[in-house]
Design a protein with these regions (language model features):
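Extracellular/periplasmic catalytic domains that process cell-envelope and extracellular macromolecules
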Residues: 12-14, 36, 73-75, 103-106, ...
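Loop/turn elements at helix/coil->beta-strand transitions in domains of secreted/extracellular proteins
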Residues: 38-42, 74-79, 106-110, 142
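N-terminal "domain-start" segment that seeds a small globular fold
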Residues: 5-35
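N-terminal export leaders
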Residues: 1-2
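Short active-site neighborhood of thiol/selenol oxidoreductases, capturing the structured segment around
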Residues: 32-55, 80
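Short, solvent-exposed cationic patches
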Residues: 162-172
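Thiol/disulfide oxidoreductase modules built on the thioredoxin-like
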Residues: 105-107, 113-162
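Structural microenvironment flanking redox-active thiols in thiol-disulfide oxidoreductases
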Residues: 55-105, 116-124
């Protein structure tokens, strides 16, 4: 745990080990798994391609963070990724449409397709992370502990400060 000079909603603080994600296919590139990313800060955007909040909030926010934290991404300290976690509209939100959406939105982050177990309405990673819907963002610290997880809109500035506090300062 770290001392935090920022204010987050009490419900957003999680402090539990991040479960493995269960991905049927990676688009753009495969970032690895929670264990192989030990020592890195991980930001996951759980989204659906037809989700208004994802298109208006979490998608643009991750694009902003991709620029804001470009140095930390380049030196391997920070991984930003998206998981397409479909719990409704299964026949519309296909992998083919997802790939088209990724091209259209010019998303170059790793995008995982959350795996559905046979007969299950909710995909595996969504269940493991106990997400409440989309968009939902989870932030995992360098020790593999979920430090933040929030459904819907939140104030980005305190979360950006939290991410910054988890990164190792680079020497100039």
């Amino acid at each position: 745990m770290f001392a935090a000079p920022y204010s987050l909603a009490a419900g957003a603080r999680v402090d539990r080990r991040a479960p493995a994600w269960d991905i049927s296919e990676w688009i753009n590139w495969d970032p690895g798994n929670v264990d192989s990313l030990s020592g890195k800060v991980i930001v996951i955007d759980f989204f659906q391609l037809w989700c208004p909040g994802c298109n208006k909030f979490s998608g643009p926010l991750l694009a902003h963070w991709q620029q804001k934290f470009a140095d930390s991404i380049a030196d391997g300290q920070l991984i930003l990724m998206k998981i397409h976690t479909v719990f409704e509209g299964h026949s519309y939100q296909t992998v083919r449409r997802l790939k088209s959406y990724i091209r259209e939105k010019k998303i170059d982050l790793p995008v995982g397709v959350d795996r559905h177990a046979d007969g299950e309405r909710l995909p595996e990673t969504m269940r493991r992370y106990r997400t409440r819907g989309t968009p939902e963002i989870a932030i995992i610290d360098r020790d593999g502990i979920i430090q933040f997880q929030e459904f819907g809109y939140f104030e980005p500035e305190p979360v950006e400060a939290m991410i910054q506090s988890m990164l190792v300062p680079t020497r100039a």
